[in-house]
């Protein structure tokens, strides 16, 4: 993840 564009949810 992480490509959602939301820094609030840093999906590694």
From Swiss-Prot:
InterPro entries: Periviscerokinin (IPR013231). It is found in: Secreted. GO terms for biological process: neuropeptide signaling pathway. The keyword Secreted applies. The keyword Cytoplasm does not apply. According to PubMed:19808072, a longer form of this peptide exists, which is much more abundant than the short form. This is Periviscerokinin-2. It comes from Sphodromantis viridis (Giant African praying mantis).
